[in-house]
Structures are given as structure tokens and as C-alpha cells.
């Protein structure tokens, strides 16, 4: 039986243990913080799939209902497809792990995490990342870790490490930081327009904090780590690579500097086809088409990087810090509540905003705690035609969910408080064309669509992505680098970094960093933040030219929401016996009425147009009002007796008029 080992990062309150569960996995670790516990395993396939030309890493995180002492909903009473949160946590874990596997290691690797228990106080995503790193460290899988992960908040100007769910309500920062011993590996999160200088301070602070969990993983690996296996590393045969270089010559450089993305791809494919025929003739039965694809990846990367590092020349002719041409249009569609088209180079997003009522909010059934619902949603759709292809369509991919979440948390900080603007808001970004940074186009288009809908945001939010091209020395350190602003798809693919930063003129609202190299030095990170801030201001200038402030009125077809305060003692009168009065008002006006359950007397009215809203307000005033002496009312005679008439002056309020008080010349009974 395996021996149990425990290590603890005391300041962080995180405990790592192994030796109890999953003894046959490559590596298995249980991570706990408070009473929240996550199990993570890491296992690699022993053989390579035939024709494998990419690294098949799969990271899956699942939350078990048993962790919260609950039954799954639905007929089958079993966990189903992964939730949005599970997908986002899986992606969060995948991104910092991937760059640390050896180049050429293409065996399938599975990292699987389960939420085993939750105290609904401590979040599990940070535990998943630390557990995955620890599982790989003690496994037989080659991996250049460890990494440490921490969540950082800021409350009243002070950084808070791994804040609880309750503390996050008061935090102006939600930073998830992942780093190695010396450098950062991945960041993501949001902030309430935090200044760039403070943002960098948060990164440096978080890097110091993770050192304890990194040391704990190293200690665990020393106690029980398995010997690393020798796996076959896939490499392009030198003779194939040399022949392809000989055939392409300078033609590859000519191909990648074609005017458009499609022309570049056509030119590269033509050169590739010629090289493929030459290799087939030379190598005969030993010819492998996969080797051609791998060789051309290497050659294209060399040409892209050489031109940027030596000549400062990018594929589309821009200098490293240049933006592509930007155009902004608003109000592009009828009837919708808000619409905008944001175009940057060959990237284009059609963004639509819709206003709804409190009945349209999205309920959140988070097992680990947090908000019960959210009234702002941003959905991102990436159809295959946006890259000129035919492909899978109809279901949201993990990538679409991840990009939508990034854009959503970047726009959220600029929205007005719900007590000032009590609408549910949904933004949908339809990507019409893609050549890099579509998620950032969604942020810019989303801001324009909000203003076009009349949502009272004080200023625009914009986003842009920076890339990086590096040259390493013999010690594996960065000897030369160039930071690129507004990267296109090829620069993302062949480059070393994708660093997205969103914000207003006042500060940062959202961010995400992904790397292909094994760490980003802080001096380069600071350079990238400075460069992306300058670019963001230029984008905001363009957006302000298109629509400098929000529309003063909501669109004609947008719902109307009003709040009125009534005497709490009149709530019963408004509802009526068995809900009679409130049903009548709804039927007569077409408006929906919600009464706060706290007996405060706050009433919300939801109507499809202004006329229905005014009628509903009038009806509520009549029902909850008092009959005033000396005021003339137009009433309805509800009953007539010999001694007088019963008259309804206000809804539900009748009075008796005696015959001897009526001064009428003629009364018909």
C-alpha cells in the first residue's frame, strides 16, 4: 500500500496530500483549504498515437454534488455535461501547464480534477491549479514545473490573499496569478478600473506569495516523486526540413507578406504543395505528409520571428506598436435595443445588447458559493465562416465560453449599480471575421452597444492584445525580444505571448495572459502593460468619435422599468384578496409588477412601452392612495339601495352615499 505524505503551505492555509487515493494514476494529489477539498490526477499514455503531430493535453475539472451534500437535479439524478464554471476552471488550469511540457513530447496527457467537498467559503479553482502542478511533479510524466497559483483581492487599499467568497463582494480586484519560481506563467481576472501601476504591484505581490506553495510541491516531490519516464520526442527529420528550406527559399517570406490573411494562406499552401511533391519524389515510401506539415510550421515560425526581431517588420507591414485600422458603427439594426459593429483590420464583431427585467437574470447554482444570480451576461459566438471555413456549428465550444467570460468580466465594472438601472443586460458578440483578438473586439463592440441601448455608462471600455517574439541564448534565457501591439492570428500562433488587457481611461477592468514560453520576466510584462495602455487610449479615441456618450432615451422597443415606494401597510391592498388587484392591473395594463419580499413597500413595474408603464403607475396610485376630503372623484356605482348608493371611488374602496345627500335632478335605478 502507498505511504501517505502531507505537506502544508501554512501562510496560505493549503494542504497537499498523496498516497491515499488513486494509487495507479501517474500522479494523484488531494488539495485542501478550509473544508474545500479537490482531488487531481495526472496520467500520460505510454505510447504515441500514429501520425500524432500536436500535443493532446486534456484538463477536466468536475464538481460533484456530493461535495455540498446535495442531489443533482433532473430525472436521472446524475451529474451531466460540464457547467460553464467547470469549463472555465479547466481552461484556467490548462493554460499554465501546457508550456512546461518538453518540446516534441506528444503523448496524450490527462489531468482530471474532482471537487470532493466544499465549505462554500473558499473557491476551488486555485486548488485545482496547485493540485495539477503537484500531481505532475510527483508523477512519471516529464514536466518542467512546479507552478504556484493564488487569488489576490484588494479591500480598502490592502491586498488580500485567497479572499473568501464573502470578502470578494468588497474587493476591487480579482486576480488569479500563476507563476514559476522566477517568472509569471499566466494571469486572468478583473478589476474596478485599477491604475496600471497598482496592477503591476499586484502582480509582483502575488509572485512573492506563491513561493510558499511552490516550495511545498518541491518538498512533496522529494518525499514521494516517481522517476520520470523516458518518452520518445517527436522531431521533424533533418533531411525533410533541409529539403523544404531549399525549395521554399525566399518564397516563404514573399508568401507571408501578402496583403491579406487569405492571400497569405493561399501563397503558403502553394509553396507547401510544391515541397510536398519534391519530398515524395525524393523519399518515396518513406515519405510522411505529417513531416511536411511540421517542417512548414518551423519554417513559417522562423520567417515570422526573423523579420520581427531583426527588421522590425510584421506580416501586414506594421511597426511593432502600430494598431490596425479601426472603424466603429452604432445603431446598425432596427428594433434591437442596442447594436454596434466594431472592425479592426480583418477582425470584425457585430455586437447586440438586450435589456430585460429581473425575471431575465441568470440563476447560478454554484456548489462552492458565490453570487446566487447575475444580471449581466455576455455571450461570444465564433462561427466557422468568420475564418473562411466550413465546420462545426451550433454548440458553444470551450473557447467560445472562455472568450465570452473574459469579455464579460471586462465590461462588468463600468455598468451602473442595479438600484440606479434595474435592468438585466445581455450582450451577444457575433464574430463576423477573425484575424486576431476577437475577444477584445467583443469588449469594444459591447461598450458601443451598451451606449447605443441607452445604458448609462459614464465612459467606454476597450481592450487590445499584445504579443511577444523572443530569441533565447544558450542558457535558455531571453536575449532579445519585441513586444507587438494588436497581434493578428499568425502572430498569436507563431509568437510567444497573448496578453489581453481591457480598461477605461481611468484604469484596468479585465486581463488575461497566456504564454508559449516557460515564463515571462517582469520587465517585459511592464513593457507590455505600458504599450497596451497607449494603444487602448487610441482605441478609446476612435470609440468616442463614434458615440461619445450613452443615448438619453431607451430604444422604442426596450422594456420600461420603474420603482415606486408605497406605504408598507398598503401592500395587502395592492395585492388584493387572493391576488385579485394585482392580477387586474396586470391584465388591464399589460405590465408586470413585483413587490419586494422584505415588506419595505418597494414596488417594481415592468412594461413593454411608455403607455403601459403610465397606466400601471396610475392604477397603483389609485389602489394605494387615500380618498381625500374635498376632492372630486369619478366613481363607479356598485350597488343601489332605497336609502342610497354604494360608489367605488378608488379601486377596492367603496363608500355609501345616502339619498338625502345626493343633489341630483334625476336618478335612474
Residue ranges and their predicted role:
Residues 231-238, 538-565, 610, 614-634:
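Long, charged amphipathic helices and adjacent flexible linkers at domain junctions
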Residues 27-29, 122-140, 330-353, 435-455, ...:
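Conserved phosphate/anionic-ligand binding catalytic regions in large, soluble enzymes, centered on
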Residues 667-669:
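Conserved small/polar residues in nucleotide/adenosyl-binding loops
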Residues 1-232, 287:
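Long, basic N-terminal domains or extensions that often function
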Residues 140-256, 450-552:
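Mobile "lid/hinge" segments at catalytic clefts and subdomain interfaces of large enzymes
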Residues 1-45, 232-371, 559-573, 581, ...:
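Extended amphipathic alpha-helical scaffolds
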Residues 643-646:
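Short aromatic-glycine-enriched beta-strand elements
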Residues 26-110, 115-122, 181, 188, ...:
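Glycine-rich, flexible beta-strand/loop modules in the N-terminal catalytic cores of phosphate-handling
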Amino acid at each position: 500500500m502507498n505511504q501517505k505524505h502531507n505537506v502544508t503551505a501554512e501562510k496560505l492555509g493549503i494542504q497537499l496530500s498523496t498516497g491515499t487515493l488513486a494509487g495507479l494514476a501517474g500522479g494523484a494529489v488531494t488539495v485542501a483549504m478550509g473544508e474545500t477539498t479537490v482531488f487531481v490526477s495526472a496520467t500520460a499514455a505510454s505510447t504515441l498515437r500514429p501520425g500524432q503531430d500536436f500535443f493532446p493535453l486534456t484538463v477536466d475539472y468536475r464538481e460533484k454534488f456530493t461535495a455540498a451534500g446535495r442531489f443533482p437535479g433532473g430525472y436521472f439524478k446524475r451529474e451531466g455535461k460540464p457547467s460553464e464554471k467547470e469549463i472555465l476552471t479547466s481552461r484556467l488550469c490548462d493554460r499554465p501547464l501546457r508550456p512546461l511540457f518538453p518540446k516534441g513530447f506528444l503523448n496524450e496527457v490527462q489531468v482530471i480534477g474532482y471537487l470532493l467537498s466544499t465549505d462554500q467559503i473558499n473557491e476551488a479553482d486555485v486548488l485545482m491549479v496547485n493540485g495539477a502542478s503537484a500531481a505532475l511533479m510527483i508523477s512519471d510524466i516529464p514536466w518542467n514545473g512546479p507552478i504556484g497559483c493564488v487569488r489576490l483581492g484588494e479591500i480598502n487599499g490592502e491586498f488580500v490573499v485567497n479572499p473568501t467568497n464573502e470578502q470578494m463582494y468588497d474587493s476591487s480586484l480579482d486576480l488569479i496569478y500563476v507563476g514559476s519560481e522566477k517568472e509569471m506563467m499566466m494571469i486572468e481576472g478583473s478589476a474596478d478600473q485599477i491604475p496600471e501601476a497598482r496592477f503591476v504591484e499586484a502582480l509582483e505581490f502575488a509572485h512573492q506569495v506563491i513561493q510558499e506553495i511552490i516550495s511545498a510541491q518541491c518538498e512533496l516531490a522529494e518525499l514521494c516523486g516517481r522517476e520520470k519516464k523516458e518518452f520518445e520526442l517527436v522531431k521533424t527529420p533533418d533531411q525533410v526540413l533541409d529539403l523544404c528550406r531549399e525549395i521554399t527559399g525566399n518564397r516563404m517570406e514573399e508568401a507571408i507578406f501578402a496583403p491579406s490573411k487569405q492571400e497569405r494562406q493561399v501563397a503558403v499552401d502553394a509553396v507547401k504543395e510544391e515541397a510536398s511533391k519534391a519530398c515524395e519524389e525524393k523519399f518515396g515510401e518513406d515519405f510522411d505528409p505529417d513531416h511536411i506539415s511540421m517542417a512548414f510550421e518551423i519554417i513559417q515560425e522562423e520567417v515570422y520571428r526573423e523579420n520581427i526581431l531583426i527588421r522590425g517588420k510584421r506580416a501586414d507591414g506594421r511597426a511593432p506598436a502600430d494598431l490596425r485600422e479601426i472603424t466603429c458603427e452604432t445603431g446598425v439594426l432596427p428594433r434591437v435595443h442596442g447594436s454596434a459593429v466594431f472592425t479592426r483590420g480583418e477582425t470584425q464583431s457585430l455586437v447586440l445588447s438586450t435589456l430585460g427585467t429581473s425575471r431575465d437574470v441568470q440563476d447560478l447554482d454554484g456548489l462552492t458559493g458565490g453570487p446566487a444570480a447575475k444580471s449581466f451576461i455576455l455571450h461570444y459566438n465564433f462561427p466557422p465562416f468568420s475564418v473562411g471555413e466550413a465546420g462545426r456549428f451550433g454548440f458553444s465550444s470551450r473557447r467560445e465560453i472562455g472568450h465570452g467570460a473574459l469579455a464579460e468580466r471586462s465590461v462588468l465594472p463600468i455598468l451602473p449599480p442595479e438600484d440606479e438601472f434595474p435592468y438585466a443586460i445581455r450582450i451577444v458578440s457575433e464574430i463576423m471575421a477573425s484575424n486576431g483578438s476577437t475577444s477584445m473586439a467583443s469588449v469594444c463592440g459591447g461598450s458601443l452597444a451598451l451606449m447605443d441601448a441607452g445604458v448609462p455608462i459614464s465612459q467606454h471600455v476597450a481592450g487590445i492584445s499584445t504579443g511577444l517574439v523572443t530569441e533565447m541564448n544558450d542558457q535558455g534565457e531571453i536575449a532579445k525580444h519585441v513586444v507587438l501591439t494588436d497581434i493578428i492570428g499568425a502572430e498569436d500562433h507563431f509568437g510567444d505571448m497573448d496578453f489581453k488587457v481591457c480598461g477605461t481611461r481611468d484604469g484596468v477592468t479585465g486581463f488575461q495572459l497566456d504564454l508559449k514560453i516557460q515564463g515571462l520576466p517582469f520587465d517585459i510584462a511592464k513593457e507590455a502593460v505600458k504599450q497596451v495602455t497607449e494603444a487602448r487610449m487610441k482605441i478609446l479615441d476612435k470609440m468616442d468619435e463614434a458615440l461619445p456618450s450613452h443615448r438619453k432615451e431607451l430604444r422604442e422597443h426596450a422594456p420600461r422599468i420603474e420603482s415606486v415606494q408605497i406605504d408598507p401597510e398598503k401592500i395587502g391592498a395592492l395585492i388584493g384578496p387572493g391576488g385579485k388587484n394585482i392580477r387586474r392591473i396586470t391584465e388591464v395594463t399589460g405590465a408586470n409588477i413585483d413587490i419586494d419580499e422584505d415588506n419595505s413597500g418597494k414596488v417594481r413595474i415592468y412594461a413593454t412601452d411608455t403607455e403601459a408603464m403610465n397606466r400601471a403607475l396610475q392604477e397603483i396610485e389609485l389602489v394605494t392612495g387615500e380618498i381625500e376630503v374635498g376632492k372630486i372623484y369619478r366613481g363607479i356605482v356598485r350597488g343601489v339601495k332605497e336609502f342610497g348608493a354604494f360608489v367605488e371611488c378608488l379601486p377596492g374602496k367603496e363608500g355609501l352615499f345616502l339619498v338625502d345627500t345626493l343633489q341630483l335632478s334625476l336618478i335612474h335605478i
